[in-house]
């Protein structure tokens, strides 16, 4: 009787040990599954890499509790069998299990809320306050001079929107016909007046450069007209109360009063573009007391 040489059959104990090792290695993978396309699980190595590479200041705002997008993993048949046990629409939902460690999630764009800009009332009040506090401004006109005809021409002029206790929001001027600005206005009465906050409380205490964008700048655009005889007395009070030296200016220059019929208001009080203010909000606003 011949004995055939061959491999010895595997022992039951060895096969059982091999199965136990495989199940131990695969058991962590059955813990959680991804049910949302915006999150994923990461390993400890990737976690350390994210921590070391992430230097943006906005990163804390991107992290959120996304436990609701993670669920315990079950076979597909279990989800189908439990469909009739799920709460109906409108019923109170149970709190989802906490998210496991090592989970990273991006916040969706729809959930982000940006800080709202100042409202129209606040902008209008700031504009009226600056208009009342300003004693001078830069008036830009369309030049009629031959060398620069049709180009903008600017001139710094004393202004006033009324006496200290009576703000109108309308800038008044004390002009002479010999000023080139008046010659420009006779042909084209449209002009722009820029009022800077160079002497404001904030700029004086916090800003070195008065032209810093954080200093408020108000631009009024409209039609320059002569003050009617009925308003001359008020114009005198407005200008002479803020500029007493005007009373002694030489009379041979034939001084007269003008004002701007405002059509557009623009306010800049931070980095970036200017904000438009409606005439209704501008004249309705009450300037802050100094």
Swiss-Prot record:
Keywords: Glycoprotein, Secreted, Signal. InterPro entries: CREG, CREG_beta-barrel, Split_barrel_FMN-bd. The keyword Zinc does not apply. Brain specific mainly in the limbic system and faintly in the spinal cord but not in cerebellum. Disulfide bonds: none annotated. Pfam families: CREG_beta-barrel (PF13883). It is not sure whether N-glycosylation is on Asn-165 and/or Asn-166. It is found in: Secreted. Glycans are attached at residues 165-166. The keyword Mitochondrion does not apply. One of its GO terms (cellular component) is Golgi apparatus. Its main location: secreted. PANTHER family: CREG1 PROTEIN, PROTEIN CREG2. Belongs to the CREG family. This is Protein CREG2. It comes from Homo sapiens (Human).
